[in-house]
């Protein structure tokens, strides 16, 4: 049982702290990015250096780049290469792990999950578009039991950034996440039911961890392929990856320049 006394001040203090955090200028940004090809244009743009003695943990494949741009400490975190296959560790599990480790070790003011995605042309997406995500869901966690079905969908809002959206004139839409590049019939049914515009393999997992640890998160997603288009997804993805990651870097740079000197409530 809590002791008697001035309990009111104990209750109010976290609210004051939370308010001061919102009004304090943003000083630390972490980018969570799944693929090296998606990350390197941003790393090169800001002249970031790879950390050799990573605070994220010893003996892990995770890659951390760090540096300073204007008044911001910028960290870019990637899950690195699969030890057996040598390819990027894409998908929800690696994304969840590096998001958790990054928040714990780097204590960012805000997380930006930047990467490529599939888009639906019926929802207005085009190759090369960079979207600011409104909210995220999963499309491959099918649990047909009351309440568990909602848990499976996992709807979460991105941090609201109306001023950023207006300044950069970005498209906005819902992102649906699953662990497959292709889209099964069941996936498609849920994506349509959830009214998603974009499809990726990490976003909702990053959102889950950010929500768990109460860190604001925004999502920048650049369209490499049209899920409802005529070309095979894998072929179109690889064909457009280089050009689209350049577009992603350009938008991410504008986002960083907008964030600099502002607090969370300014976004």
Curated annotation (Swiss-Prot):
Enzyme class label: hydrolase
Keywords: Amino-acid biosynthesis, Hydrolase, Methionine biosynthesis
Binding site for S-methyl-5'-thioadenosine: 116, 199-202, 225
Description of how activity is regulated: Inhibited by CBL3 in a calcium-dependent manner. Inhibited by 5'-methylthiotubercidin (MTT) and by formycin A (FMA).
Enzyme Commission code(s) on record: 3.2.2.16
A GO cellular component annotation in the UniProt record: plasma membrane
Catalytic activity line of the entry: S-methyl-5'-thioadenosine + H2O = 5-(methylsulfanyl)-D-ribose + adenine
Active site: 38 (proton acceptor), 225 (proton donor)
Binding site for adenine: 199, 225
GO molecular function: methylthioadenosine nucleosidase activity
Keyword Amino-acid biosynthesis recorded: yes
Tissue: Expressed in roots, leaves, stems, cauline leaves and flowers.
PANTHER family xref list: 5'-METHYLTHIOADENOSINE NUCLEOSIDASE, 5'-METHYLTHIOADENOSINE/S-ADENOSYLHOMOCYSTEINE NUCLEOSIDASE 1
Annotated protein name in UniProt: 5'-methylthioadenosine nucleosidase
């Amino acid at each position: 049982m809590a002791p008697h006394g001035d309990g009111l001040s104990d209750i109010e203090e976290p609210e004051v702290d939370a308010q001061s955090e919102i009004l304090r200028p943003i000083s630390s940004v972490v980018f969570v990015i799944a693929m090296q090809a998606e990350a390197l244009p941003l790393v090169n743009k800001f002249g970031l250096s790879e950390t050799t003695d990573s605070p994220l943990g010893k003996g892990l494949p995770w890659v951390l780049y760090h540096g300073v741009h204007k008044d911001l400490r910028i960290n870019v975190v990637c899950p690195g290469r699969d030890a057996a296959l040598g390819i990027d560790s894409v998908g929800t599990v690696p994304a969840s792990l590096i998001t958790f480790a990054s928040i714990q070790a780097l204590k960012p003011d805000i997380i930006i999950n930047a990467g490529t995605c599939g888009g639906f042309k019926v929802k207005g997406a085009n190759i090369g578009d960079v979207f600011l995500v409104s909210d995220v869901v999963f499309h491959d966690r099918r649990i047909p039991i009351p309440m568990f079905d909602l848990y499976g969908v996992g709807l979460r809002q991105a941090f609201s950034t109306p001023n950023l959206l207006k300044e950069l004139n970005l498209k906005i839409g819902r992102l649906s996440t699953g662990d497959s590049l292709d889209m099964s019939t069941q996936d498609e049914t849920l994506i349509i039911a959830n009214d998603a515009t974009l499809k990726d393999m990490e976003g909702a997992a990053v959102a889950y961890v950010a929500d768990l640890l109460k860190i604001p998160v925004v999502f920048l997603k650049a369209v490499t392929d049209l899920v409802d288009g005529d070309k095979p997804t894998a072929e179109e993805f690889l064909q457009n990856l280089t050009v689209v990651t350049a577009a992603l870097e350009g938008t991410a740079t504008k986002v960083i320049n907008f964030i600099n000197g502002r607090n969370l409530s300014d976004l």
